[in-house]
């Protein structure tokens, strides 16, 4: 048996749902999707869900992962085994841990490949900071996986599809985290997972002000702007949501233009699936050139304006 009888899908990030649903279609005979509202439920059915389970009644001061109890109860009530697919977001991983405990299931995070043989999941994911690929065969009846972005293709909606909708009512957990306040994040983030062209800057750009040069290039060629982890986490020059690497974004654009990025393995794990990699770095020995299809050795601050002018013609 090369599929599970049932798969259970939930995504706290709506943009990740089409990819998870495509994976579900390949891995199971029946697809169950947990959603937070009617609109997401309608989308899930168009993407292939046979059954939609609307999570209902969570107080505003409680976290999404507090649904773990009723989600696990629902899963157990409908089969003695099954596969659970979640996105590898922060909330997704927190929910995965809670479900793993309640289902007595093995949990595997950041899966980049998933297959099924004899009713058991085999999962591959990065280990040792991206230096190697680890493979795990999950032996527990239930398997809970968080899926890296780009693992599956995106499912296409079909308005002719039909499915059944059910309601799952909130049950307060015995121990819960209560949200006491929220603060809006200042962010101009975009969905980089869908970008065809990406210009990504590293600390070699020199300063926060010089990022404007990369932004001008993005406007000229219709690209989206990303960065390396040090730019976001250490220098605080850009938003956390834009950094590429093993612990955040895993991209597969047609073009990845790396500007002032050294090319350490932790970063390249998030970019080396790009169709074409173009590197600009003043260090001719930078590791990025080992991955690049094309490269320019030189000062990015001088090269970017010239490149922008040439491509804008």
UniProtKB/Swiss-Prot annotation:
InterPro entries named among the record's database cross-references: DHS-like_NAD/FAD-binding_dom, ETF_a/b_N, ETF_a/FixB, ETF_asu_C, ETF_asu_C_CS, FixB, Rossmann-like_a/b/a_fold
A single MF term (Gene Ontology): electron transfer activity
Recorded family membership: Belongs to the ETF alpha-subunit/FixB family.
Gene3D superfamilies: HUPs, TPP-binding domain
Short name of any one Pfam family annotated for the protein: ETF_alpha
Known function: Required for anaerobic carnitine reduction. May bring reductant to CaiA.
Protein name: Protein FixB
Database matches in PROSITE patterns: ETF_ALPHA
Phylogenetic placement of the source organism: Bacteria, Pseudomonadati, Pseudomonadota, Gammaproteobacteria, Enterobacterales
GO aspect biological process, one term: fatty acid beta-oxidation using acyl-CoA dehydrogenase
Quaternary structure, from the entry: Heterodimer of FixA and FixB.
Pathway entry: Amine and polyamine metabolism; carnitine metabolism
Record's keyword terms, sorted: Electron transport, FAD, Flavoprotein, Transport
Residues the record lists as binding FAD: 255-283
């Amino acid at each position: 048996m090369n599929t599970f009888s049932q798969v259970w899908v939930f995504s706290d990030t709506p943009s990740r749902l089409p990819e998870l649903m495509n994976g579900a279609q390949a891995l199971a005979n029946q697809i169950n999707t947990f959603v937070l509202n009617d609109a997401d439920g309608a989308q899930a059915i168009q993407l292939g869900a046979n059954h939609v389970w609307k999570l209902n009644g969570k107080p505003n001061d409680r976290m999404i992962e507090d649904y773990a109890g009723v989600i696990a109860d629902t899963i157990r009530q409908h089969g003695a085994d099954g596969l659970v697919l979640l996105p590898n977001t922060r909330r997704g991983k927190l929910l995965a841990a809670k479900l793993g405990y309640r289902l007595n299931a093995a949990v595997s995070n950041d899966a980049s490949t998933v297959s099924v043989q004899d009713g058991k999941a085999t999962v591959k994911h990065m280990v040792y900071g991206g230096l190697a690929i680890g493979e795990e065969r999950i032996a527990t009846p239930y398997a809970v996986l968080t899926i890296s972005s780009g693992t599956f293709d995106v499912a296409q909606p079909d308005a002719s599809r039909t499915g059944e909708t059910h309601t799952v009512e909130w049950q307060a957990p015995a121990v819960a985290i209560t949200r006491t306040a929220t603060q809006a994040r200042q962010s101009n983030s975009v969905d980089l997972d869908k970008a065809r062209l990406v210009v990504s800057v590293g600390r070699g750009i020199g300063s926060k002000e010089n990022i404007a040069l990369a932004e001008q290039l993005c406007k000229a060629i219709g690209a989206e702007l990303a960065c390396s982890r040090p730019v976001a986490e250490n220098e605080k020059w850009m938003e956390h949501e834009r950094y590429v690497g093993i612990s955040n974004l895993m991209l597969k654009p047609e073009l990845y233009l790396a500007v002032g990025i050294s090319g350490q393995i932790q970063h390249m794990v998030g970019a080396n699936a790009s169709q074409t990699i173009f590197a600009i770095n003043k260090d001719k020995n930078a590791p990025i050139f080992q991955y690049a299809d094309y490269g320019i050795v030189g000062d990015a601050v001088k090269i970017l304006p010239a490149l922008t002018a040439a491509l804008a013609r």
